């Protein structure tokens, strides 16, 4: 189950964007071997709100494009498919039988700015940010170069499956 909550009014969120985000998240989770019903919340915000959340949660007082709040903990360098595939989750991890993977907070305002900066579509930018964030919910990171290469490759593979590419 994917919940999309639009908490901003600066960028008009299209129904077809929500549909595509649902499809991409579902595809990414299947590709990453999430073999249980799941719950993810995607919250659209503006730059002001994401700046406040970024400051409150990370101590960084500036706007960003997307924030990921995973509900599961992962050993360093391990991801969902290595840590939790076929795992028997306790009720504290479930909501109505679905595994709560976490929340994605996405600034549509920042996504629009970045799409112009990188000279590609708003749709491509939003989809990239969602895929990036979903991979964080599944334990991927990009702190060291080796992890970054793996994560970038996964992002591009997922986007290419939807014919979404740079440019």
UniProtKB/Swiss-Prot annotation:
Compartment(s): Cytoplasm
Species of origin: Clostridium tetani (strain Massachusetts / E88)
- Key words, A-Z: Cytoplasm, Endonuclease, Hydrolase, Metal-binding, Nuclease, Ribosome biogenesis, rRNA processing, Zinc
Main location per the UniProt record:
cytoplasm
Please report the name of this protein according to its UniProt entry: Endoribonuclease YbeY
Under the heading Pfam families, the entry gives:
YbeY
Q: Does the keyword rRNA processing apply?
A: yes
GO biological process, alphabetically ordered: rRNA processing
According to the record, cofactor stoichiometry and binding are noted as: Binds 1 zinc ion.
Query: What Gene3D superfamilies does the record tag this protein with?
Result: Metalloproteases ('zincins'), catalytic domain (3.40.390.30)
Q: What does this protein do?
A: Single strand-specific metallo-endoribonuclease involved in late-stage 70S ribosome quality control and in maturation of the 3' terminus of the 16S rRNA.
PANTHER family the UniProt entry points to: ENDORIBONUCLEASE YBEY, CHLOROPLASTIC
EC number from the UniProt entry = 3.1.-.-
Q: Which cofactor does it need?
A: Zn(2+)
Q: Which gene codes for it?
A: ybeY
Q: Which taxonomic lineage is given here?
A: Bacteria, Bacillati, Bacillota, Clostridia, Eubacteriales
| GO molecular function annotation | metalloendopeptidase activity; RNA endonuclease activity; zinc ion binding
**Which family does the record claim for this protein?**
Belongs to the endoribonuclease YbeY family.
Q: What class of enzyme is it?
A: hydrolase
Identify the InterPro entries for this entry: MetalPrtase_cat_dom_sf_prd (IPR023091), YbeY (IPR002036), YbeY_CS (IPR020549)
Positions bound to Zn(2+)? 132, 136, 142
List the GO terms this entry assigns under cellular component, sorted alphabetically: cytoplasm
